[in-house]
């Protein structure tokens, strides 16, 4: 029998994510909305918009909704039936609209879940700031709390490891000598100075490294590479090495096959489908390296259970209410 959960903990759950345009034609306004009106960025805007056109749009929102549906089913088995809303920073439905709609519908206490495995200003703090900016002006703002991060939690590690093992299986006998290459989104070095997340200054790269080490151990690999991808600009310093540069370096040393594992992403959206499956694949083919890409965690049951665990921790830890009294 499912144990009864604290019904007064939260009346709603908000999944907070990046977002993406569902059609290729919407790629340009989407990218421009991120980069802004800087004239120097126009060429890069058109270049990246072309990736969305090439793929016919981004599946990001659709895949996030699939995660929310799977999460709702898992939570229901635990006695948690609070409705789940999905809001995006860079595309419809925008966080400002979702938060306002939740408040208008009478929701009062919301648990936010940031869909990012590693914390930095752009992947964590910016999301929270966006939600706060949407919430504060409301006549009756939501009382917001966020679930904890989970970069080394078992569900994320196990789900990632399963996806990587499946990718190595594709290689057959070549798997033994294939390289395991982890990727995460490259970020500007100066962005670390803005980071407020975690107990250490900008935990993004240490968390990525810790995730990779744990996942590699679960896969049974003692050797692996850490790389970054999808650098948004040629200006300034960014986290390195770049995925394509590392492939070139390893190919020069005799590498013949590689499994790329985009553990910095939670679903197979454009940064994965284009920057890896098109660009990194092209680099591999040019150098005679067999390319295999592990799927992201998506709706893997272990990952969904992990999200549910983090939500349940908050629900069970919330004070129980009786009238105007808080029962501690």
Where are these regions (language model features)?
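Active-site-proximal alpha-helix that buttresses catalytic centers in soluble enzyme cores
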Residues: 2-328
């Amino acid at each position: 029998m499912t144990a009864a959960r604290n019904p007064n903990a939260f009346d709603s759950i908000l999944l907070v994510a990046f977002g993406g345009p569902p059609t290729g034609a919407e790629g340009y306004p989407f990218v421009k909305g991120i980069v802004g009106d800087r004239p120097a960025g126009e060429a890069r805007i058109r270049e990246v918009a072309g990736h969305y056109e090439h793929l016919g749009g981004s599946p990001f929102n659709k895949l996030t909704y699939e995660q929310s549906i799977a999460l709702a089913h898992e939570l229901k088995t635990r006695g948690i039936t609070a409705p789940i809303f999905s809001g995006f920073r860079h595309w419809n439905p925008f966080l400002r609209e979702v938060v306002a709609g939740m408040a208008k519908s009478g929701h009062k206490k919301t648990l936010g879940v940031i869909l990012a495995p590693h914390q930095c200003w752009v992947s964590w703090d910016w999301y929270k700031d966006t939600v706060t900016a949407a919430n504060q002006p409301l006549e009756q703002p939501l009382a917001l709390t966020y679930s904890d991060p989970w970069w080394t939690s078992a569900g994320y590690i196990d789900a990632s490891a399963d996806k990587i093992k499946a990718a190595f299986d594709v290689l057959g006998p070549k798997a033994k000598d294939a390289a395991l290459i982890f990727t995460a989104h490259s970020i500007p070095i100066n962005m670390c100075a803005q980071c407020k997340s975690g107990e250490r200054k900008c935990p993004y790269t240490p968390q990525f490294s810790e995730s990779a080490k744990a996942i590699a151990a679960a896969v049974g690999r003692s050797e692996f590479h850490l790389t970054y991808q999808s650098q948004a600009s040629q200006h300034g310093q960014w986290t390195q090495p770049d995925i394509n540069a590392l492939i070139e370096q390893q190919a020069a040393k005799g590498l013949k096959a590689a499994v790329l594992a985009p553990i910095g992403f939670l679903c197979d959206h454009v940064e994965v489908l284009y920057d890896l499956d098109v660009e990194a694949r092209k680099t591999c083919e040019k150098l005679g390296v067999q390319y295999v890409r592990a799927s992201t965690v998506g709706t893997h049951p272990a990952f969904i259970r992990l999200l549910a665990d983090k939500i349940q921790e908050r629900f069970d830890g919330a004070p129980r209410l009786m009238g105007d009294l808080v029962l501690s």
